Design a protein with these regions (language model features):
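Substrate-binding N-lobe of the ribokinase-like
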Residues: 1-49
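Conserved phosphate/ATP/ADP-binding segment of small-molecule kinases
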Residues: 98, 104-185
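Short, acidic/turn-prone active-site loops that include or flank metal/cofactor-
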Residues: 20, 44, 65-69, 114-118, ...
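Conserved phosphate-binding/catalytic region of the ribokinase-like
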Residues: 151-246
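Residue-level signal for inorganic ion chemistry
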Residues: 5, 86, 135-139
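Gly/Ala-rich phosphate-binding loop of Rossmann-like dinucleotide-binding domains
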Residues: 6, 104, 211
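Conserved phosphate-binding/catalytic loop of the ribokinase/pfkB sugar-kinase fold
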Residues: 14, 37-42, 50-94
Length: 246
């Protein structure tokens, strides 16, 4: 997410916990001029690792070890923190709950994007996240689960926040605002090489647009465009922009 946001011209402030093996990755972020003041390190444990297996149809199975991520709640968002917008993306369970409350206390609007972390939470907890958030983003599968667990339709969820986005992969995405749905078409990539990191590329673009006060469909369209660039390159941090952001 931070790579995408920085590439577009934003100034990300990632909050994360690395393990004792994380020095090279921290150096990588710093080489990209990404501010790492909120990246901590936990000794005697490994950095979170995901092994993602992708078939020829781009279906994926992920094996995940959380490692130091389980201590991510030790990072705190102070009441006086200065940020335009934040995101609650997949993280340790305690960190997601606590950081959402801390965003609210600091008066920082945020996106709730639970991703693969969604099954960790009860319907009551998910409802509270939605009440705290300014925006919600999910894929179509997560959207169904979110509706099932909260008992709210997508239209109802969209009325509780400033906007809801449901990503649909190659079909683009649906933007819900005040109960009304708008389809934002996908951008056709030059080639399909590797889907790993497409969601994070999209998230970074979303944050870039929200920080600038763009309407949600415009933010989603930029996300689709950056995601199309990412999928044409192998690896989550090897793509570059082929356009200027206006």
């Amino acid at each position: 997410i931070a790579y995408s946001l920085k590439l577009l011209g934003g100034e990300p402030l990632p909050m994360a916990m690395l393990g004792s093996d994380g020095a090279d990755y921290l150096q990588r972020l710093e080489s990209l001029d990404i501010d790492c003041r909120h990246v901590g390190q936990v000794q005697d444990t490994y950095t979170a690792q995901a092994m993602i297996m992708t078939d020829r149809d781009n279906n994926q199975i992920t094996a995940f070890h959380p490692g130091a991520m389980m201590q991510a709640h030790a990072n705190r968002i102070d009441v006086g923190a200065k940020a335009s917008v934040g995101i609650i993306a997949p993280d340790g369970r305690d960190a997601m709950l606590e950081h959402a409350a801390q965003f609210v206390a600091a008066g920082i609007p945020f996106v709730f994007d639970p991703g693969q972390g969604l099954p960790m939470f009860s319907g009551e907890e998910l409802a509270k996240f939605i009440d705290q958030a300014s925006w919600v983003t999910v894929n179509d599968y997560e959207g169904k689960m979110l509706s099932d667990r909260t008992g709210w339709t997508l239209a109802e969820i969209s009325r509780k926040v400033e906007g809801l986005v449901v990503t649909l992969g190659a079909e683009g995405c649906e933007v819900w605002v005040a109960g009304e749905k708008t389809h934002v078409p996908a951008v056709v990539p030059k080639q399909v090489v590797d889907p790993t990191g497409c969601g994070d590329a999209w998230r970074g673009a979303l944050l870039f647009g929200l920080e600038r006060g763009w309407a949600l469909p415009r933010c989603a369209a930029l996300g689709n465009r950056v995601g199309a660039l990412k999928i044409a390159q192998r690896g989550p941090q090897n793509y570059t922009l082929d356009f200027a952001v206006e």
